[in-house]
Amino acid sequence: MGTDRDSGYSEHGRTSRHSGTRRGHRAKRRTRRIVLGGGALATVAAATVAVTVASAGQYSGSAAGADHAVFVQGNELDGNTIHAFARGDDGKLKPAGTYETGGKGGDQIDAPTDSLASQGSLVYDDRSGMLLAVNAGSGTVTSFRVEGQRLKDRKVVSSGGEFPSSIAVHGKTAYVMNAGGEGSVQGFRITGKGLKPLKGSYRSLGLDNEDIPRFDTSPGEVDFTPDGRNLVVTTKGNNTVEVFPMKRNGLPAVAEPVVNESAGGVPFAISFDATGKRMLVAEAEKSTVTTYKVNRDGKLKVLQQPLANGQETLCWLERAGNYFYGGNTGNSTVSGYVMDKHGKLSLTNDVGIATPPSANSQGVIDLAVTEDEKFVYVQNAVSGTVDGFRVESDGALTKVTTAEDLPVFGESGMEGIAAV
């Protein structure tokens, strides 16, 4: 008895547990993402958001779209939430409300600090003015319309698979990466009424995970190349970087991805340089970054061999101008990198640390960069905090703020952050 993946309807009942774009600015597109399986691919909830906010007069946001905002995904198992913050011109954060997503958070098996074990679980899309969040524990994706720092018009749809953990956006198209089971990517159209399933877009990743995957065998991220011609997925357990060449209509041009062996061990996060022509992949095994060219046919060319930062367990990577910042969860540090005009990547200093580590900033995970590339925000899962840093002219980071009382890593923990 078959299942139509794109309509979401099945002739047999599901036996799963389910009940129901970038953390930072990306070059050559207007999408920001925040880091982290399913039933019918149709809207399953559209309700008034439960929210605690200050009066509207206290917000500096514009009438449409996000403005001076940072969003943090709580990823709570009993009900996922988005914590909104107003961002001052000096980078300091003030709480601006907590919003229920209408889905549940998730926790991958044996995850050490990062419950979703991914990058890109929370995405703000400038073009549509929408914030997109995964609900890993209920196999759904939530969209909100953003006004300033406020979230409105919640819509919830099935992710099309098990344990959604990453979202990519290009133009009017979004793809969700499902980490559980065989793993998959599922496409959606971004509309004024939320996400609509894109017929014919579902593609399997051919993995062999449980519905709730192990953190070290789950895929790490899905992302579009800035020109939209390729959709890229990292797989930690298979040690591959897999690419789907895309058609202009937003559908994959191939039934199966082009599989490239990773130059470094355990590929995790994806980022691109300011030109959009070079792809950087963070690799957790030896805390390295490899620079690639993504060819139109999906094959990768190594432009620079893995560069080690001397830290422990690099998993997340974001760009601010010609600088890149990586989160090392093994020893709770942030590394800085700089790319010269020839595309050569190097560390910003000899020790590989962009800012001094802090006892109150433990369990470094996901990062976000503001659209003006002046500030970097870092999640500390063990401490339950977010640190904000000013980007200095030499690439060093100066701490300007700390947001506290966020969900601390335990049975699960926060993961996913976006900055505007």
Kindly label every feature range from the protein language model:
Residues 48-68, 75-76, 250-252:
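C-terminal region of N-terminal signal peptides and the immediate post-cleavage residues
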Residues 93-103, 152-158, 196-207, 253-261, ...:
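Beta-propeller fold detector
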Residues 85-92, 144-149, 189-196, 244-252, ...:
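Short loop/turn segments immediately following beta-strands, especially the blade-tip
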Residues 75-77, 87, 136, 179-181, ...:
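Short loop/turn segments immediately following the C-termini of beta-strands
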Residues 4, 25-58:
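Secretory targeting and sorting signals
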